[in-house]
Structures are given as structure tokens and as C-alpha cells.
Design a protein with these regions (language model features):
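Active-site beta-strand->loop->alpha-helix modules in alpha/beta enzyme cores, enriched
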Residues: 1-106
Length: 106
């Protein structure tokens, strides 16, 4: 079965919390899962923590769910400023659709 699940999450951890069980189940059933977060929310990370902690955590969490490392994509759109980047985000979604041709999108 060569089917692809595409998960679109505004921020890291939104996809895992929102549909982590589904991601895991689809992967167990032979699907490829591509996980995309549009922001690592680095501006919101507390100063005493590594600035890339959320990026590291999403890689670990998605790996636990069965997402291949190369299929965990984190863009650098600034948190709380998505409306300013509306066109760029839309362009990225179009590129993702063309590249992965997903069967299901969450």
C-alpha cells in the first residue's frame, strides 16, 4: 500500500496532540506519514531553554509515531504572525500537495 497521510500543524505539538493516535495507526497500516509544522515557535521558548527545543521535541515525538526523520518538516514562520505570511504559507501548502500527493490531509 503506497498511501500518504499529510499532517499540517500550525505549531510543533499541535499535530501530535490533535491526531497522534491516527498518525500512529496509519503508519502501522503501511501508510507514509508526512508531518509539517509551520512554526517551531522559537520566539515563545523560555530564555533558560535551548531555542530549538520545540524543533527537537517534535522530531522525537513524530519518530515515536512512526514518521521518518525526512518526513518531519518544520518551517520557520514566526508564531503569531501567520496572517502576514499568508501567501507564503499557501505557496508552501501547494508545494507540499504537489510533492507528496497525499491521500488524506489532517
Amino acid at each position: 500500500m503506497n498511501k500518504t497521510l499529510l499532517v499540517l500543524a500550525p505549531h510543533t505539538d499541535d499535530g501530535e496532540f490533535g491526531c497522534g493516535g491516527c498518525i500512529s495507526k496509519f503508519v502501522q497500516n503501511g501508510w507514509r506519514a508526512v508531518y509539517v509544522a509551520f512554526s517551531a515557535a522559537e520566539q515563545s521558548v523560555l530564555p533558560h531553554l535551548p531555542h530549538d527545543i520545540l524543533r527537537t521535541e517534535v522530531k522525537e515525538a513524530t519518530a515515536t509515531l512512526g514518521v521518518a526523520d525526512e518526513d518531519c518538516i518544520v518551517f520557520d514562520f514566526e508564531v503569531r504572525r501567520f496572517p502576514e505570511f499568508r501567501q507564503q504559507i499557501l505557496d508552501r501548502m501547494i508545494e507540499l500537495n504537489r510533492k507528496y500527493a497525499p491521500d488524506i490531509v489532517f
